[in-house]
Design a protein with these regions (language model features):
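Hydrolase active-site cap/lid region
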Residues: 178-235, 244
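Short beta-strand/loop motif that positions the catalytic acidic residue
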Residues: 248-250, 255-257, 261
Length: 283
């Protein structure tokens, strides 16, 4: 009887080990898919991330400064800097949307320049002329934004800095708002951000494939995916979720979102507004 019990226990441990190994393998595949999946097709958006003709033409025409800074891991980041002529120690960092580049921010730059701000339009990692082969979804964006803040502070130690992001850039701004370094920013504007990376993935994959089994599979794989994320990047999903991170924010926050937005539901903005920790916030 003891031998049978030992055999059963051994088989159970073996099965559990195989299950964990299979889960770990699948979780790592899910991690790779986060970065390499054709999100432009899944989300139904155009891919202009490497089309730099417009921004280069405007830099040449108006004499905007093309700038390069290294991030903490050595990745080269690229941006365009437009200095205000009135030296009022105010600047804004503009962050573009998914599969776009800093050229998307030009209309917003005009608004801030009229208000007397110096403007820094940057290419997010994996976009434009910045290093990286794919969207980063916030894994390194706090460090990347630190590099840009350091760039502005080196120009003017008294610089008061705000961050305005659109779509993916809005999500990155919200992640930064909850960081220790982000507390020093004077304001944040989040235009059309998603609230939860996992919820965004669930909704868009369901719409893209029409197969609810994949959504169920995401839930089953979630612990293994998070393990892979931690092994690779020392991050968990909560570190990449604007809803979670903006709850720590203390700087003034303006959330913008169109009620007819078909890419990111307006409810995401309502959730973000409800949970944001900023004492001064508007939707």
């Amino acid at each position: 009887m003891g031998c049978l019990f030992s055999l059963f226990k051994g088989l159970l441990y073996t099965a559990l080990l195989l299950l964990l190994l299979a889960g770990g393998f699948a979780g790592n595949m899910a991690y790779e898919e986060l970065f390499h999946a054709p999100w432009d097709q899944i989300l139904g958006i155009e891919n202009h991330r490497r089309d730099l003709s417009q921004i280069h033409a405007m830099e040449n025409r108006y004499g905007w400064q093309s700038v390069t800074v290294p991030s903490e891991d050595g990745t080269r980041l690229k941006g365009s800097y437009i200095e205000s002529g009135n030296r009022n120690h105010r600047a804004v960092i503009l962050l573009h949307g998914l599969y776009q580049n800093r050229a998307m921010c030009v209309p917003y730059a005009d608004i801030y320049r009229e208000m007397g701000y110096s403007v820094l339009m940057v290419d997010l990692r994996g976009h434009g002329e910045s290093g990286g082969e794919y969207p980063d979804w916030g894994v390194h964006d706090i460090e990347d934004l630190n590099a840009w803040v350091d760039f502005l502070k080196a120009k003017d130690p008294s610089m008061q800095i705000g961050i305005h992001g659109i779509s993916l850039g809005a999500a990155m701004a919200l992640l930064y708002s909850g960081s220790k370094e982000g507390e020093a920013m004077k304001f944040y504007v989040a235009d059309s951000s998603y609230a939860s990376l996992m919820e965004l993935g669930r909704e868009k994959i369901m719409r893209y494939t029409g197969d609810d089994r994949l959504v169920l599979g995401m839930d089953v794989l979630n612990p293994f995916f998070q393990a892979a994320l931690f092994v690779h990047d020392r991050k968990l999903l909560r570190d990449l979720d604007p809803l979670v991170q903006s709850a720590k924010a203390r700087s003034p926050l303006l959330i913008l979102h169109g009620k007819s937005d078909t890419l990111i539901p307006y409810g995401a903005a309502e959730d973000l507004f409800s949970e944001a920790g900023s004492p001064r916030k508007e939707l």
